[in-house]
């Protein structure tokens, strides 16, 4: 009897766990259907062979992004990669339900093989304060030198700090003391295209054909169903979700590619790159010794010149 009770209890708990997992995307759409989850699920590598970061496939507007890293770092040292995502904090974006809300931001940092997130016990108190409330994770198990963050509130995180641990060539034979490229992509606001290829409600809707707008029907959710009679006589239906505002009226003639709504998008995506040098401690010490030798030689040369001038002056007086 007791065994049957335990078995039933285990089955019930398993059913609850499965139900929660299935309902999570519905209860938390902003967390699931947001950058960078789309990219992680759809692309093995976020940077295409052309150099373009795949986030640009959904975030169509171009916006600036900046990255700052040290010019050179030593092996097994922690440094900051600072990503700047500037935008006007006064603007509001169209959310999934059509209302206006604040923008969120996200970023993907692509580092060379061997560079990893710095362990918490290696962070300084200042670094811990800068990264407080920001969850940074590897892109995937096979891409541990690519890091993603977001979506997070943009108002508090226009600057994102990535604490990075530099690799040591002595421990990793694939790492060398050379100059490496660093790539970054960052977005602010929602995308215009879903991974399925469908438009979101944060983009402009236009007429695919030339004709006449014969009917505008408002839906229960607040969107519109537009019926366009093409020049060939065939009716065409366009679904406009809640969010974009119409700029056309019923009975109006429209041309191909003519805007039917305003463009509600206020965000966008940007990418840039920089370089970082993994410095050899022996080379740095050798360079310091070389500079010290040069400076010492210059000092000795000046002293020798002064001594020679004094001897010449003494001989002239004699």
From Swiss-Prot:
Signal peptide: 1-34
Cofactor(s) the protein requires to work: heme
Transmembrane segments: 284-304
Subcellular location: Plastid, Chloroplast thylakoid membrane
Cited Pfam families: Apocytochr_F_C (PF01333), Apocytochr_F_N (PF16639)
Main location: plastid
One Gene Ontology CC term in the entry: chloroplast thylakoid membrane
InterPro entries: Cyt-f_TM, Cyt_f, Cyt_f_lg_dom, Cyt_f_lg_dom_sf, Rudment_hybrid_motif
Cofactor note: Binds 1 heme group covalently.
Protein's GO biological process: photosynthesis
Residues reported to bind heme: 35, 55, 58-59
Keyword annotations from UniProtKB, A to Z: Chloroplast, Electron transport, Heme, Iron, Membrane, Metal-binding, Photosynthesis, Plastid, Signal, Thylakoid, Transmembrane, Transmembrane helix, Transport
Record's bilayer topology term: Single-pass membrane protein
A molecular function GO annotation: electron transfer activity
PROSITE patterns attached to this UniProt entry: CYTF
Record family assignment: Belongs to the cytochrome f family.
Entry-linked PANTHER family: CYTOCHROME F (PTHR33288:SF10), PTHR33288
Purpose: Component of the cytochrome b6-f complex, which mediates electron transfer between photosystem II (PSII) and photosystem I (PSI), cyclic electron flow around PSI, and state transitions.
Assembly notes: The 4 large subunits of the cytochrome b6-f complex are cytochrome b6, subunit IV (17 kDa polypeptide, petD), cytochrome f and the Rieske protein, while the 4 small subunits are PetG, PetL, PetM and PetN. The complex functions as a dimer.
HAMAP family (alphabetical): Cytb6_f_cytF
Name this polypeptide is given: Cytochrome f
